[in-house]
């Protein structure tokens, strides 16, 4: 397994997943897309823990050598087009024969609209946290998310029930 990461908060989840899988005896490595963007504090913390845990760090060019890819390049906060090395890495993932599992939402999908922000990962599965994201339910994001699993992260069910919906879907939206 290879966990492919950018440097934001979502990628901290991908690094944490790699670390937990490693602790369970799964062979997993981490590839960080190297650019000049500032790392988030959460990402830096997870990277330190991963390094102290003995995880291997490899170059993103190794993507085709792995059976399973954890997509942690971008998360729900993405609001700009995917360009440069990020677009190249997404192309590499999509052209490989890897099984791809995205964290929260496939990288390159607008989490609020399901729109592709110029390039997007085509996931076989997506593990999203707390609740499903709109972008995983509306096309084209729905088509690129694969099988979506909502992981419970401890949100109080009673609190969620009291929330008013902020948007509604028609049957055409959900086809």
Spell out what each predicted region is.
Residues 66-175:
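YjeF_N-associated NAD(P)HX repair module
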Residues 1-69, 74, 79-84:
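A cross-family phosphate/adenosyl-ligand binding-site feature
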């Amino acid at each position: 397994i290879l966990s492919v990461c950018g440097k934001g908060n979502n990628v901290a989840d991908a690094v944490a997943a790699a670390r937990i899988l490693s602790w369970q005896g799964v062979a997993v490595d981490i590839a960080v897309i190297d650019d000049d963007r500032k790392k988030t504090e959460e990402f830096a913390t997870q990277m330190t823990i991963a390094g102290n845990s003995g995880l291997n760090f490899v170059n993103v060019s190794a993507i085709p050598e792995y059976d399973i890819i954890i997509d942690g390049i971008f998360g729900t906060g993405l609001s700009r087009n995917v360009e440069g090395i990020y677009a190249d890495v997404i192309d590499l993932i999509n052209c490989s024969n890897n099984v791809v599992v995205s964290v929260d939402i496939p990288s390159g999908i607008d989490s609020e609209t399901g729109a592709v922000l110029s390039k997007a990962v085509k996931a076989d599965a997506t593990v999203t946290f707390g609740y499903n994201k709109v972008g995983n339910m509306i096309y084209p994001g729905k088509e690129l998310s694969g099988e979506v699993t909502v992981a419970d992260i401890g949100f109080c069910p009673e609190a969620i029930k009291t929330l008013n919906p902020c948007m509604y879907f028609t049957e055409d939206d959900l086809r």
